[in-house]
Amino acid sequence: MDDYQVWQDVPAFRRLYNKLDLSLRLGYTCGPAGVPVPKTAEYVVRPIINLSGMGATSYVQKIKKDIDHDVPLGYFWCEMFTGDHVSINYSWRKGELYPLNAVQGFNSKDELYRFSSWKRLPEIPNYDLPDWITETMGAHKLNIEFIDGKIIEMHGRHGMDFPENATEIVPVWKDTEAEQHVFYHNTKDWIFKPNYEDADGTLDNPRLGFYYR
């Protein structure tokens, strides 16, 4: 199920796709375009709602205090967290939320969408969840992304494209150098899976697929 289908089918989940509202409820320092930041620093700038996924059009920017015109309309700024980027899949069963699996992603602040790899974690981190997590029950499936244990977004479906029994994936992007293709293609145990994703045309550098093992 895609995020737009969750939006259509689970009205109670719609509020949680509003990342500005989510960040405010979680107590983060954040605000919409037109609201100046409280201090000069680097902030994450993202669309308030993005149902296309992939972190498309999100970026890190240094914004000066009291400047209120550096963020595009429809976007918001939020304090930036550093630490492990972890994605956890959960399922609701009989009113209880159960974690199923977790993966850690590796990217850089220069290109937030572009992950160099994802690795399955042998143990699922026990991160704190808000009391209002029960609002997600209608979706049955839940994916939460964390940075340093702090929630950055929620999805009413399971995340990641890990094939069964895979422990690591390496995304291949349109601009991935040929030498990297050759390396993984010729290295034992790595298998290529075509899996095109351009976030509904918003990524100029789409993902073509990934190697996994």
PLM region spans:
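Active-site nucleotide/adenylate-binding loops and adjacent lid/helix of ATP-dependent enzymes
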Residues: D2-D131
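ATP-dependent carboxylate activation and anion-phosphoryl transfer catalytic cores
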Residues: M54, L97, F106-D110, W118-R213
